[in-house]
């Protein structure tokens, strides 16, 4: 006969629910399972969820050792998805990574990507609030002891070709 109820699957589901709650700022969330046998072949699984206090963002700071990027981060601060008074939300942090890397690319930092935007979340000073430090830094090259910097690129000269010029140019390349 097929197995309908699996205790391990129920515990795994409880762990997934707890993990989801933590991404929404409920860092002390607990989820337990309770099963009841109603009939011979019928089981009811209840998930008891205690969310705890949902953390609120008290402070957001932006930091980059490159002065030009630091100035841009300060300029873009008002566009941030992370706002004082909002609940902590991992989706907003991911959106913030994407926003910063896109803005940097639009400013000529071609190699900017979401993985250069890091977060330090401090939950130690208050049980209900947290502070977030948004840091932009390049990964350090293991062969080089100097700090890596993000290179800015400029497009100096360009020429617009009409379709026929482009067609002739492409044929010439072959």
Give short role names for the model-derived ranges:
Residues 1-174:
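Periplasmic polypeptide-binding modules associated with outer-membrane biogenesis and secretion
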């Amino acid at each position: 006969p097929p197995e309908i109820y699996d205790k391990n699957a129920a515990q795994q589901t409880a762990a997934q629910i707890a993990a989801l709650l933590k991404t929404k700022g409920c860092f002390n969330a607990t989820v337990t399972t309770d099963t009841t046998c109603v009939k011979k072949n019928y089981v009811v699984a209840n998930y008891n969820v205690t969310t705890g206090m949902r953390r609120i963002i008290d402070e957001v700071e932006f930091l980059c050792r490159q002065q030009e990027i630091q100035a841009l981060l300060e300029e873009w601060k008002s566009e941030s998805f992370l706002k004082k008074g909002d609940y902590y939300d991992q989706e907003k942090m991911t959106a913030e990574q994407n926003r910063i890397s896109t803005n940097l690319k639009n400013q000529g930092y071609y190699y900017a990507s979401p993985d250069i935007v890091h977060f330090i979340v401090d939950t130690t000073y208050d049980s209900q609030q947290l502070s977030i430090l948004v840091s932009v830094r390049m990964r350090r090259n293991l062969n080089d002891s100097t700090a890596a910097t993000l290179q800015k690129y400029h497009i100096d000269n360009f020429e617009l070709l009409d379709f026929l010029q482009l067609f002739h140019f492409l044929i010439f390349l072959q």
